[in-house]
Regions:
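A contiguous loop/helix-start segment that scaffolds small-molecule binding in enzyme catalytic cores
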Residues: 2-3, 26-28, 34-37, 110-115, ...
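Class I S-adenosyl-L-methionine
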Residues: 2, 26-47, 52-149, 154, ...
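Short, conserved loop/helix-junction motifs that constitute active-site signature segments
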Residues: 59, 77-79, 193, 217-224, ...
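Short gly/pro/ser/thr-enriched loop/turn and capping motifs at secondary-structure boundaries
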Residues: 72-73, 91-94, 150-154, 171-174, ...
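Signature of uroporphyrinogen-III synthase
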Residues: 45, 97-101, 235-420
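Positively charged N-terminal leader segments that act as targeting/secretion signals
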Residues: 7-20
């Protein structure tokens, strides 16, 4: 589709300047479009906790390089033509070593791609985002860091545990229980952590939980201090185990908790008894499969998650164009000749008006036809086009729609039913 400069300015006043600048950058780069890599924090698991900027970038990505995320729904936000590359990392199981991931990002950037590196949590909180940024900087590839909500704060919050509380503490320490396998000596200062005041939060440490708790106690940590482990935090399959620094490892083992999980140590864990809001939601702990098309599943999935459910999107239907396109196109062109237009689904409305506006520019060209809809979802879609529904059945099925039309006391005349 061709747009002149005036049309571009009307659509977006800043777009024309952006395109001019982009063209200039390509010229300065020897005719090759300059790529960019976005190091994007996907948040702790719930896709609703990604930042607005983050979701915007996923929707613009040409290449999506992603880890083993808690929610795969984010991948569906990318354009259909977007290349998706899995480089999943969890504990010692890596689809690609970090050095190869760095090289991949550099290669894609040099190829002029708009790359989104989607990382769980925050890219700069034990996410090795700093190493990837270093590699891009050394290669001269432009990059942008988009912070994410870290599970160090969100995980405890969803378990009813604030990491700070004026009644208990005014500081907290975050550390990792997982270090590089090739390191000759640990750089983790467990003595300093044991002596630190306030809340202590450990990420990626479930395999070493017993060793860490034992070491902390050995360095002076009070064994009776409350502690909690939160697995799959912020999702509908979240599980929380509480105890003390001394008892937590055994309780975690008995409950079968594993990675990914966040461990919290401190008196703030006492607040869970009164502040545990998420695990009390009506659908918490329920796994629900949404079989709608990917384009339509998002709103329903989001509503279910807000009620605490774990949602799996598994489309079993696909909206296809009419098999007889010529016949359908002719019926749309002659829409103004009908007395009634009857719509049986929101998809029917969408397809009808895609074809309609390919021919007509004004909604008034639809003529004086009266409008019937099968249900409130279809009615809502028609309202988006400025059309009011005059007939809607009490039962939102095809039989109910036919009966409603029959019950209309005026002569129906010719009916166009948009089912395809």
């Amino acid at each position: 589709m061709f747009f002149d400069n005036l049309a571009i300015n009307e659509m977006n006043p800043g777009m024309a300047g952006f395109l001019v600048a982009k063209k200039r950058m390509v010229e300065l780069n020897g005719g090759m479009q300059q790529g960019i890599v976005y190091l994007l924090g996907a948040g702790p698991g719930d896709p609703g906790l990604i930042t607005v900027r983050g979701r915007e970038l996923v929707g613009m990505a040409e290449v999506l390089v992603y880890d083993a995320l808690s929610s795969a729904e984010m991948l569906n936000w990318a354009p259909a033509a977007c290349e998706r590359i899995f480089v999943g990392k969890r504990a010692s199981r890596h689809a690609l070593p970090q050095e190869e991931i760095n090289a991949l990002l550099v290669r894609l950037g040099r190829a002029g791609k708009k790359v989104v590196r989607l990382k769980g949590g925050d890219p700069y909180v034990f996410g090795r985002g700093g190493e990837e940024a270093d590699a891009l900087h050394e290669a001269g590839i432009p990059f942008e860091v988009v912070p994410g909500v870290t599970s160090a704060i969100a995980g405890p919050a969803y378990a009813g545990i604030p990491v700070t509380h004026r009644g208990y503490c005014t500081q907290f320490t975050v550390f990792t229980g997982h270090e590089g396998e090739n390191k000759k000596a640990s750089s983790l200062d467990l003595r300093g952590i044991a002596e630190a005041q306030g809340t202590k939060v450990m990420l990626m440490g479930m395999r070493k939980l017993a060793d860490v708790c034992e070491a902390l106690i050995g360095y002076g940590q009070e064994p009776s201090v409350p502690a909690a482990a939160v697995q799959w935090a912020t999702t509908g399959i979240q599980r929380t185990v509480t105890g003390t620094v001394k008892t937590l490892p055994a309780r975690v083992q008995k409950a079968g908790l594993g990675a990914p999980a966040v461990v919290v140590i401190g008196d703030v864990v006492k607040e869970r008894e009164s502040l545990n809001w998420f695990e009390k939601l009506p659908l918490f702990g329920k796994r629900i499969v949404v079989t709608r098309t990917r384009a339509q599943a998002g709103e329903l999935s989001a509503r279910l998650r807000r009620l605490g459910a774990e949602v799996l999107e598994m489309p079993v239907i696909r909206i296809a164009p009419p098999s007889n396109r010529r016949e359908f196109a002719e019926s749309v062109v002659h829409a103004h000749t009908y007395d009634w237009l009857v719509f049986s689904s929101p998809n029917g409305v969408e397809r009808f008006f895609q074809a309609f506006f390919a021919v007509y520019r004004d909604i008034r060209s639809i003529g004086g036809a009266r409008i019937a809809a099968i249900g409130p979802g279809t009615e809502a879609k028609l309202r988006e086009y400025g059309l009011a529904v005059e007939v809607m059945p009490k039962k939102f099925v095809a039989e109910g729609l036919v009966k409603a039309c029959r019950d209309a006391r005026e002569e129906i005349g010719t009916i166009e039913l948009s089912t395809f």
